[in-house]
Amino acid sequence: MNYNGVTEYLLQWCVEKREEYFRRNLQERADTGRSLLFVKRFFFDEMTYKVLYLVDRDFADFGAYQAAVRELIPLRKSYVLEHEKDREALAFLRETEQECRDYVDRLRETDWAPSKCYCRAVFGEERERLEYAILEKWNYRAEYWYPLVGSPMGETLFLNVEYLEPYWDRLCALTGLPGSRLYEYGESCYEDGQILEVDVMESYGGTECAYLPKDLSWIIYFSHEDTVTFAGSILGPVKELLAAEREHWN
């Protein structure tokens, strides 16, 4: 069985800890000019992503679920690389890892929270197959995809994100949201590109990110240069939606 309610409960705790250490780090730096609490903040920042691996996974029992959470605790990307010889920074990291282990030990099956939206990290063989399929279809790898340079995707439409913002809700409706799920494929601090299965399309955040449907029949790509590109079967409806912005196309 899956423990999605517990996973949501755990996720909310990780978010709370991340924000707590973010605030404390700023305050300590303001007070003393120095703080290593960023180590704790980045630990929980990474955990908020990694717990998404647990969504919809089946476990034999709750003990197996807890064991899977513990396996996520070691940092994949060390935020203390600049301080490898700084024992204080490493001590902060070990202390934070233990804080997380202790919390997982205290988790119970009754620790449950409702999910505000669906978000699952795609990993393993499923991720490998999906990465290959997206590369074959759209020549996209969660890295800068320049829409003017020759590529096999055919016709595209691109414009600056600012001209799309007034149409955001209607664009989401064109994608089938909220009644369907999309793949969100973008750059990440924690992986060589992260793929999430989501039922919400987040507003532009300034990073490389693409949204695709389950059949990969279209792509919406946001670049770090404030542009958005559309290609595939969604192109016709998007042209109708953005007809008033034609002077800003391409």
What are these regions (language model features)?
Residues M1-N250:
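Structured alpha/beta or helical-core interaction and ligand-binding surfaces enriched in interleaved
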